[in-house]
Structures are given as C-alpha cells and as structure tokens.
Curated annotation (Swiss-Prot):
It comes from Metamycoplasma arthritidis (strain 158L3-1) (Mycoplasma arthritidis). This protein is one of the early assembly proteins of the 50S ribosomal subunit, although it is not seen to bind rRNA by itself. It is important during the early stages of 50S assembly. One of its GO terms (biological process) is translation. Belongs to the universal ribosomal protein uL13 family. This is Large ribosomal subunit protein uL13. The gene is rplM. Disulfide bonds: none annotated.
C-alpha cells in the first residue's frame, strides 16, 4: 500500500532564483515571486511547511506599472496617532524606495501568518542590477 509522504522542513531542497524586473508588469512579476516563495511550483507542496525557494529580484526600479498607475495608485499607512493616515503615490514611492513597490505587492500575495512572514524573508529585492547573493549562484528565471 502507498503512503502519502509528509514533507518536513529538514527534507526541503531550497534553491536560489534570480528574476530581472526590468519592463515586467508588477502583477505578473509578483505572482511568480509569491508562488516561488511559497513553494507552489514544487510537486510536493505542503501548505503548512516553509518549502519555498529564495528569490532575488534585480532592477526593481524599472518594473512596469500599466494604465497610469504611477500617478493614480496610492499606498496608505497609518502612524498610530489620531489623524495619522499617510499616503504616497506609486511614482513617489518608486523615487524614495524603488524596491518597496515589489515588496508590497509580493507581501500582499503571501499568507498573513507567521509562516508568511518567514517566507517573505526569503525575498531579496534590489533597485539596480547588482546584488549580494552572487555566492549562492541563483538560476535566472524569465517572466512571461
């Protein structure tokens, strides 16, 4: 009789991937990154185990926003004080913190649990073409 194999974090084979975000729509990029971080691309996917791979995203400042979202998309956050609702457009956010656009999009697609926070720590986003994970020899992935 066949038994279902239970994947444990010790048996998970984590790989490193490199994705170039230049001229790639933000939604397509972030769905691919979120799926890879969760491990949904693996045939042994288990929702309660961190089995996702590590992802390095380069050229985040050149990610593509369609339909005038640069001016119209607004990101909100609250300081915690009365009247402390702050807002920033995608264009201003791209100028201040270019990697934050990709990080916010991917974070919203991961589970909002302790496991999701752990998976999010496997994401490394860089504004330019240089990154610090050369020693891991990440494999390049093309976004369609």
């Amino acid at each position: 009789m066949h038994q279902t194999t239970i994947v444990k974090k010790e048996t998970v084979d984590k790989k490193w991937y490199l994705i170039d975000a230049a001229n790639v729509p933000l939604g397509r990029l972030s769905t691919l990154v979120a799926s890879t971080l969760r491990g949904k691309t693996k045939p042994t996917f288990t929702p309660n185990v961190d089995m996702g791979d590590n992802v390095v995203v380069i050229n985040a400042k050149e990610v593509l926003l369609t339909a005038k979202k640069d001016e119209k998309k607004i990101y909100y956050h609250h300081t915690g004080y009365p009247g402390g609702l702050k807002q920033i457009t995608a264009k201003d956010l791209r100028q201040k913190h270019p990697e934050a656009l990709v990080e916010k999009a991917v974070r919203g697609m991961l589970p909002h649990t302790a496991l999701g926070r752990k998976q999010f720590r496997n994401l490394f986003v860089y504004a330019g073409p240089d990154h610090k994970q050369m020693a891991q020899q990440p494999m390049k992935i093309e976004v369609k």
